[in-house]
Regions:
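Class I SAM-dependent methyltransferase Rossmann-like catalytic core
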Residues: 4, 8-39
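C-terminal alpha-helical "lid/dimerization" subdomain adjacent to the S-adenosyl-L-methionine
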Residues: 153-198, 208-209
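Core SAM-dependent methyltransferase catalytic element
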Residues: 208-223
Length: 223
C-alpha cells in the first residue's frame, strides 16, 4: 500500500481492518499504560496536549479519549497524518461528541500552534528509513515537552508467519494480508533501536526500549 495507487474506498476499508487488527492484538495497550505513567504527576485540573503522528483510522486517539474520560484527565487530542485520505476517514469514524483535531501534513514540516506535552506514534515508524527515524526522534525531542512514545513491531519469525495465516483466515483486506508480513519484516529489534537512538543523539539512559505482548517493541522517553 506504500507504493500502490489506492482508491478512497480501498484505503478506508484497509484502515478499518487495521483498526480491527489493532483491537485483536492489543496494540494500543502499551501506549495507554505509558500515558498512565507519564501523567501521574499532573494536577487533576492540568490539561495536557497529546499529538499522534500517523493516526490512520484515528482509533488510537479515540482510545486515548476514552482513557482520559476513565482517568478524569483533561486532554487536547491532535493527530497528523501524511495521507490526505486519512483525515476524512478518521473524522467519519469518530463520534461527534469526541473532540479530536485531525490534521493532514508531513510531520517534518509541522510546527504545532500550541505547546505539545506528549507525542505518540503507533505502527508508523517501520515505514521510515533509519535516517528519517533519527530525524523524527530529534523532532519529538524538540516538540514534546514532557515525553514521547513509539509503539511498533518486533521483527521475529513467529509474528511474520502467524499474522499471514491469521489475515487469510479472517479475510482481512488484501492490503492487510500483504502489508502485515512486510511491515513485520521491516520492523525492529532492540539493537536497531539502540543504533537509531544513538544517531538521534539520545543518551542510552534517557530512553526506554521495552517489549510487550504480542511482539511489540516500544521506545519511550519521559522528561
Amino acid at each position: 500500500m506504500d507504493t500502490e495507487a489506492v482508491s478512497f474506498e480501498d484505503y478506508r476499508d484497509c484502515l478499518k481492518d487495521l483498526a480491527t487488527v489493532n483491537a485483536l492484538t492489543l496494540t494500543h495497550g502499551p501506549v495507554l499504560t505509558w500515558l498512565d505513567r507519564a501523567t501521574r504527576n499532573l494536577a487533576p485540573n492540568e490539561r495536557a496536549t497529546v499529538l499522534d503522528v500517523g493516526y490512520g483510522y484515528g482509533d488510537l486517539l479515540r482510545r486515548v479519549h476514552d482513557w482520559s474520560r476513565r482517568k478524569g484527565r483533561l486532554v487536547d487530542l491532535v493527530g497528523i497524518d501524511l495521507n490526505p485520505m486519512s483525515e476524512p476517514i478518521a473524522k467519519a469514524a469518530t463520534p461527534s461528541d469526541v473532540s479530536i483535531d485531525f490534521r493532514t501534513g508531513n510531520v517534518f514540516d509541522y510546527t504545532p500552534e500550541r505547546p505539545v506535552d506528549f507525542v505518540i506514534s503507533s505502527q508508523t515508524t517501520h515505514h521510515m528509513s533509519n535516517e528519517e527515524l533519527a530525524t523524527f526522534i530529534r523532532w519529538m525531542e524538540q516538540v514534546a515537552a514532557r515525553g514521547w512514545y513509539i509503539a511498533d513491531l518486533h521483527r521475529h519469525p513467529v509474528p511474520f508467519h502467524v499474522f499471514g495465516a491469521l489475515a487469510r483466515v479472517a479475510r482481512w483486506h488484501r492490503f492487510v494480508q500483504h502489508d502485515g508480513p512486510v511491515s513485520i519484516a521491516r520492523s525492529f529489534r532492540k539493537a536497531d533501536w539502540k543504533k537509531i537512538l544513538h544517531a538521534a543523539g539520545v543518551a542510552p539512559e534517557a530512553a526506554e526500549i521495552r517489549w510487550h505482548v504480542p511482539f511489540r517493541l516500544c521506545v519511550s522517553r519521559l522528561k
